[in-house]
Amino acid sequence: MKRTYQPHNTPRKRTHGFRARMKTKNGRRVINARRAKGRKRLSV
């Protein structure tokens, strides 16, 4: 049986990357929340 997670960097960056987050209002909210929490990595 084929596993569900087949990693590829391009779609990963496109959907969860920093630039993708900055495109939307809610994405920016995610980044700010992670900054406030003190996350080492803000995005993928």
Curated annotation (Swiss-Prot):
UniProt entry keywords in alphabetical sequence: Ribonucleoprotein, Ribosomal protein
InterPro entries: Ribosomal_bL34 (IPR000271), Ribosomal_bL34_CS (IPR020939)
The keyword Cell inner membrane appears for this protein: no
GO CC term, one of those recorded: ribonucleoprotein complex
Gene3D superfamilies: 1.10.287.3980
Keyword Ribonucleoprotein set for record: yes
Pfam families to which the protein is assigned, alphabetical: Ribosomal_L34
Example GO biological process: translation
NCBIfam families, per the entry: rpmH_bact
Family: Belongs to the bacterial ribosomal protein bL34 family.
Protein name from the UniProt record: Large ribosomal subunit protein bL34
Organism: Helicobacter hepaticus (strain ATCC 51449 / 3B1)
Organism placement in taxonomy: Bacteria, Pseudomonadati, Campylobacterota, Epsilonproteobacteria, Campylobacterales
